[in-house]
Curated annotation (Swiss-Prot):
Cell compartments where the protein resides: Nucleus; Cytoplasm
Organism listed in the record: Rattus norvegicus (Rat)
Residues with PTM Phosphoserine: S34, S36, S44, S47, S61, S75, S142, S146, S186, S188, S266, S269, S275
GO cellular component, one term: cytoplasm
Alphabetized UniProt keyword annotations: Cytoplasm, Isopeptide bond, Nucleus, Phosphoprotein, Protein phosphatase inhibitor, Ubl conjugation
UniProt record similarity statement: Belongs to the FAM122 family.
Residue stretches of biased makeup (Low complexity): 177-187, 245-256
Example GO BP: positive regulation of proteasomal ubiquitin-dependent protein catabolic process
Highest classification ranks of the organism: Eukaryota, Metazoa, Chordata, Craniata, Vertebrata
Name of the protein in question: P2R1A-PPP2R2A-interacting phosphatase regulator 1
Length: 286
């Protein structure tokens, strides 16, 4: 390349000396043109400059595509392989990520189910604990003590007209909702009353006063009237001894002659007079 440029510099001053119009002087023009680039318009196609340059350019052109031809086919293959490797790596990462995400979902689902089971078990325990106090029947305590439930207290019964202990009262027919003990039936207060010993004597005295014979002597009736007045009082009963005494006094009064006739006329015997019943024949004669 340096030799060709030197040849061109030497040939140009010779040509330029023949044509002085193109430059100022022959000497000066040659020196200037040697330092500057060659004139392309002044050269012909048959000049050796282009002939020498053309093959070199062709050689460069031929070698340059050849190098690109050798390099270009290899680069797509490398890019393709790297791309495949990258895609495989991404797919592997995707698989790993998917597995990790799936494991996390499974763990969260297990934790949720475990928490639900614990919550259900806790709720069941709470229900049992809350239901256990309800099974115990609490007895309410009022501020004022009950007169009927006090220990060792007595209550006045208007029907019996006496004081009765709280244990002797009959139980209520309606069971109490607060007491859980079984109700025990107590003895009726009516059965607790002892029968009166003077009851049959009172009835006997009343029957004797109602069925009194009318044919007794006046003295006997007077004596009996005082006894009847005593019997009419409540709570007074005449014993059998007093009745025997009245009968003996009646017998002694019959010893007088004036009174014997009156007593002998009566058909009633002393035994019948003492009995409270009157025969049917006597009632029919009356």
């Amino acid at each position: 390349m340096a030799q060709e440029k030197m040849e061109l510099d030497l040939e140009l001053p010779a040509g330029t000396g023949a044509s002085p119009a193109e430059g100022g002087g022959p000497g000066s023009g040659g020196l200037r043109r040697s330092n500057s680039a060659p004139l392309i318009h002044g050269l012909s196609d048959s000049s050796p400059v282009f002939q020498a340059e053309a093959p070199s350019a062709r050689r460069n052109s031929t070698t340059f595509p050849s190098r690109h031809g050798l390099l270009l086919p290899a680069s797509p293959v490398r890019m393709h392989s790297s791309r495949l490797h990258q895609i495989k790596q991404e797919e592997g990462m995707d698989l790993i990520n998917r597995e990790t995400v799936h494991e996390r979902e499974v763990q969260t689902a297990m934790q949720i189910s475990h928490s639900w089971e614990e919550s259900f078990s806790l709720s069941d325990n709470d229900v049992e604990k809350s239901a256990s106090p309800k099974r115990i029947d609490f007895i309410p305590v009022s501020p004022a003590p009950s007169p009927t439930r006090g220990i060792g207290k007595q209550c006045f019964s208007p029907s019996l007209q006496s004081f009765v202990s709280s244990n002797g009262l009959p139980p209520s027919p309606i069971p109490s909702p607060t007491t859980r003990f079984t109700t025990r039936r107590s003895q009726s207060p009516i059965n607790c009353i002892r029968p009166s010993v003077l009851g049959p004597l009172k009835r006997k005295c009343e029957m004797e006063t109602d069925y009194q014979p009318k044919r007794f002597f006046q003295g006997i009736t007077n004596m009996l009237s005082s006894d009847v007045a005593q019997l009419s009082e409540p709570g007074v009963c005449v014993s059998s001894d007093t009745l025997d005494g009245n009968s003996s006094s009646a017998g002694s009064s019959c010893n007088s002659p004036a009174k014997v006739s009156t007593t002998t006329d009566s058909p009633v015997s002393p035994a019948q007079a003492a009995s409270p019943f009157i025969p049917v024949d006597e009632l029919s004669s009356k």
